[in-house]
């Protein structure tokens, strides 16, 4: 939709919301990590880059989803504990935003239940009105996975997969948070070797 809008001369921020029923889905949220990577230890810059990028294709919670993930990855350069990173990122979200209320709810569910499955079932019920590709319920899944992963890469991937929803997008973002925070040694070789040290990208050249 955003590409079509741009081709028709509709530029950001209008390109993100005009004729766009997917404006608050996960398409921008899944791009957040790269903005955090290029702004190590500078969550404000990461947030600004993410906001600029997200408003091309999304609006409202769709934008804040990218900001949230960018902030978490940026914080990973200066904080090693995933649970602390999540809490810090939540505190940086606008207090009056719907997105903040969702990630705050997810955090409180984790605190209340003390176990990932109960916490996730609570969130899943609370946000069942949303499409499974919407940014908000997937943000809750990220919070639950990072909260209970105990800084363990295998456990993190298992938890985020068990939550369901848009699993590949969520896994990519939270795995990046942990990898930055804990370093490459946190990832077992069995996750890396099948790729044969090769990356396929859409980027030309």
Residue ranges and their predicted role:
Residues 2-23, 32-42, 51-56, 70-164:
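Accessory "access/gating" subregions that flank catalytic or transport cores
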Residues 26, 35, 174:
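Short glycine-rich loop/turn motifs that provide flexible caps or phosphate-binding loops at active sites
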Residues 26-28, 62-64:
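Hydrophobic, membrane-interfacing alpha helices
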Residues 45-53, 66-67, 195:
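Short, conserved phosphate-binding/catalytic loop or strand-edge motifs used
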Residues 58-61, 67-74, 144-205:
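Catalytic phosphate/nucleotide-handling subdomain of diverse soluble enzymes
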